[in-house]
Design a protein with these regions (language model features):
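His/Asp/Glu-enriched short active-site or ligand-binding loop at hydrolase and phosphoryl-transfer sites
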Residues: 75-86
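Extended substrate/RNA-proximal surfaces in nucleic-acid metabolism proteins
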Residues: 1-77
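Short acidic/histidine-rich active-site segments
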Residues: 105-120
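Conserved short secondary-structure transition element at the edge of the structured enzyme core
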Residues: 77, 96-108
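Short, charged, surface-exposed secondary-structure boundary motifs
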Residues: 62-63, 86-90
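Mid-to-C-terminal alpha-helical segments outside catalytic/metal-binding sites
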Residues: 122-140
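Short, hinge-like loop/turn segments at secondary-structure boundaries
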Residues: 13-14, 69-72, 94-98, 124-128
Length: 140
């Protein structure tokens, strides 16, 4: 959610996701939210889209209070599967497990942008039995 997003949003130059075509995958900086973060999400909703926040577990500035506020606004959460495998460090893994345990995730995906990156992550990581169970029950 940056100035380029705002420009594209105003021009209706958006790439929606989902079977109904009204999901909008969004992300922010890992360290700071945009100044008008909640207002932007509300504008997205008013335009008929459902905001989907990519990898909420990776945002260092967020805590449970932030996650609960976002969920109360109707924002869906997409877990980065490699976060659950510990690829982004212990703090991200801890947040990922907490969000999973609270049933806050709606979708799963990866943040891999090419096949080489995917292969590296897959070769390095394994999930525990408990993590696999959590994924299986993810919004059945």
């Amino acid at each position: 959610l940056d100035s380029l997003f705002s420009e594209r949003f105003e021009q209706n130059d958006l790439l929606a996701i989902g079977t109904s075509g009204n999901g909008l995958l969004v992300e922010t900086s890992y360290y700071n939210p945009p100044m008008d973060f909640y207002d932007i999400l509300e504008k997205i909703r008013k335009k008929g889209f459902h905001p989907v926040l990519a990898h909420p577990e990776r945002y260092r500035y967020m805590d449970m209070k932030d996650y609960q506020k976002l969920k109360s606004m109707g924002v869906k959460f997409q877990m980065n599967l490699f976060s659950l495998a510990g690829s982004y460090g212990e703090e991200t893994l801890r947040k990922c497990c907490m969000l999973l345990a609270e049933g806050m995730y709606d979708l799963g995906g990866t943040d891999t942008h090419n096949l080489a990156m995917f292969r590296r992550f897959v070769a390095e990581k394994k999930l525990s039995k408990e993590e696999c169970k959590g994924l299986i029950t993810l919004k059945k």
